[in-house]
Design a protein with these regions (language model features):
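A short acidic (Asp/Glu
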Residues: 46-48, 124-127
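Conserved N-terminal glycine/acidic-rich loop preference
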Residues: 86-125, 147-169
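Short, contiguous clusters of charged residues that form electrostatic/catalytic patches at enzyme active sites
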Residues: 21, 66, 70, 95, ...
């Protein structure tokens, strides 16, 4: 979820801003298939379960904060990788993404690497969903291209994923 609200918007952090260029470079230089997610909420966000626990409007569909960061968009335009449609998700993890990856790669020998925001919420949720859908596939997370809500929660999420056989690079 390399979206404006997570980088320099309503939920942005210094750490998130610091990974934009490394993430863009990774996208630009990647060869393979790129899938992505977009945190997507509606105007009623504050009345949802998530909104009650995190009462900060963010990633409202169609607003500037919902859009991908411009440097990330430029990298997507320049990459030679095959970029697939990004999955819109109203929750931390994307069941749709896990299902697409399962249907596409279940009988193939592939590696899946995750990058992005936020390590301790969406990245860990998606990593666990993907690992559950594809238990024999190597799943990894590039920690240099991730940031959490806080540096401590970022580290905790990396440790938790490591315990679930997700490689941290």
């Amino acid at each position: 979820d390399m979206q404006n609200d997570f980088i320099d918007g309503s939920l942005g952090t210094k750490e998130a801003q610091e990974i934009v260029t490394p993430v863009a470079e990774k996208i630009r230089n990647f060869e393979g298939d790129i899938y992505g997610t977009l945190d997507t909420h509606e105007e009623d966000y504050l009345s949802t379960q998530e909104g009650k626990n995190l009462p900060v409007k963010h990633c409202i569909c169609g607003e500037d904060g919902w859009a991908l960061d411009s440097e990330i968009m430029q990298a997507i335009a320049e990459t030679k990788a095959e970029v697939h449609n990004f999955c819109r998700k109203g929750t931390f993890g994307s069941m749709e993404l896990a299902q697409i990856l399962k249907e596409t790669y279940e009988d193939q020998e592939v590696e899946i690497e995750l990058i992005g925001l936020c390590t301790d919420i969406c990245v860990i949720s998606n990593a666990m969903l993907i690992k559950a859908a594809l238990p024999e596939v190597k799943v990894s997370v590039d920690s240099s291209c991730c940031a959490g809500v806080t540096p401590e929660s970022h580290r905790n999420a990396l440790e938790a994923m490591k315990m679930c056989q997700i490689e941290i690079v």
